[in-house]
Amino acid sequence: MNPLRPKRLGMLAPSSNTVLEPETVKLLPANGSVTAHVSRLRVVQVSAEESSLQQFDLDRALVAAELLADAKVDLILWNGTAASWLGFDHDERLVSAIERHTGIRATSAVIAINERLTRLGARRIGLVTPYVAALEERIIDNYRDIGVTVAGAVRGDLTENTAIAEIGQAEIAAMAREAARTPVDAILILCTNLAGSSVVRQLEQELNVPVLDSVRVAVEQCLELLAEEPRRA
């Protein structure tokens, strides 16, 4: 093992997601001390239809995770947000299964987001998603169940994942402003196929509240975890 090699972040990505990889690269250390490696699982549209929900079957994700293990990554991140509408226990089960099958530490974007909300003490949030009403309702209910009130919500009403990636930064920022019209403790941009990372600092200065972008929060947590993890052989 080369003790000087970069730490390797393995990411499980929805197959039609075209945002998270370029956004992740922007957030990694400029010195090259961490590299990102991606395995994909088929996800082409997001809705409350049963066929859409089945895209996030644990067994499918495990196949993709096992391929990442072949690259001897040091950490595996499920970089999707489906647990926000499937139920937060979905990602807890997935992370446990990945760790059990691969022996590699794992986390998820939703786990990172919820840990950040807890750290901030955020109990009222503004929610920005590209999703349809049925998914938004599930997300709001799931956050209510963990003591977080969605005080303002703005959605894009899209189901095709490739269309979600086309939402521009100006539109994302406008959605965040709308979600912050009522007093909130934080704004959550919930979707790893929304290019919200680059507008976070601008929005935080403008709105004077923390703004949590899914990709950014996930990468920040992973960098913290990688600092604790030894390099794999």
Task: Indicate where each model-derived feature is located.
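Periplasmic-binding protein-like
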Residues: 10, 74-79, 126-128, 184-191
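Glycine/small-residue-rich loop that forms an oxyanion/phosphate-binding "nest" at active or ligand-binding sites
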Residues: 65-107
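Short, small-residue-enriched loops and turns at beta-alpha junctions
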Residues: 82-87, 160-166, 195
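Short, flexible loop segments at boundaries between secondary-structure elements
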Residues: 158-163, 211-231
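Hydrophobic alpha-helical
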Residues: 174-206, 219
